From Swiss-Prot:
The keyword Magnesium does not apply. One of its GO terms (biological process) is cell differentiation. This is Vitamin D3 receptor. Transmembrane segments: none annotated. It comes from Bos taurus (Bovine).
Amino acid sequence: MEATAASTSLPDPGDFDRNVPRICGVCGDRATGFHFNAMTCEGCKGFFRRSMKRKALFTCPFNGDCRITKDNRRHCQACRLKRCIDIGMMKEFILTDEEVQRKREMILKRKEEEALKDSLRPKLSEEQQRIITTLLEAHHKTYDDTYSDFSQFRPPVRNSEDEGNRPLRSILTPSFSGNSSSSCSDHCTSSPDTMEPTSFSNQDLNEEDSDDPSVTLDLSQLSMLPHLADLVSYSIQKVIGFAKMIPGFRDLTPEDQIVLLKSSAIEVIMLRSNQSFTLDDDMSWTCGSPDYKYQVSDVTRAGHSLELIEPLIKFQVGLKKLNLHEEEHVLLMAICIVSPDRPGVQDAALVEAIQDRLSNTLQTYIRCRHPPPGSHLLYAKMIQKLADLRSLNEEHSKQYRCLSFQPESSMKLTPLLFEVFGNEIS
């Protein structure tokens, strides 16, 4: 009787390629797995079990070395059983009737427990799934990760070599006193805005005046202000586009929409910018080409002090380390925009109802889709980031007022910046 090579012990499951057909070691039929310590088909598995339970004694009618195949395996039970034993099948692996019953009961119990767990596990409702899908689509439509539009801004000018090559950690120090900010605050009081803002709801966002580049180059300490002013104006337009697609946002009055957009714009821009923020040594915002890699020194050249930049970098690092899913990121932006506690909101109840739907969706998503340990206290950490943004918004407002009240810097700003930040609500 011809023998085929077969293992008599349980192999490592990783040794088998799922795409390679497995062959029964007894008859050569397609094997379904390891049964009683050998690779066999269902037919030979059942034959061996029945034979062992009955303690059957078979006699070969021929010379005791019949070749067993799929077609003739029923012809000689003696040689078939001998073949089963030769390839390593063991009766010790056969369960008794009681053991079989216990195993069935355990399997049934496990299935019932899994079904109960599944029924108790939070699931996204159809409405919540629609909210997430809508926000993802809105974000993809309003955030270009190729940053191709940046070439349309006034060009970045980095002509201050003494700061340009300084590493981030030499600029951001725990002992920073913030003198530049305090000195600015000395002469930038909370006097009313001198510029009359245009109508926000009717403004053509694509028509913004640009200043003469020759004037920009004369003020090296503000060399990056024209470029970053255009960048922020561009980002505001994108935030507006995103907000309009938030489910429920268009149900608000135009007045409340404007209030929410004006008060949250810079916060959402800071949230959006986390996508391009890198945790390298220089901790920069990388937006495509080297020309659009923004470091701390670039922000200082736009007139901002470390009183804003230090907490901004800390915020960006903390947010990046949360490793948010894109779904969580867009929900956080929407929650940030639709905040009922913004000063000037008229229908706070409706705004709160919209925000509650978004918040509930975020919490359910985290429980359903964000595996531990990253999900631990994640919602609370995200809400804390919104509180951090309020502080950043307040500091940005102070520093923006300093810029807007100085003729040499205000002339670098855009009409949209004056409209959104020039008539500060918060």
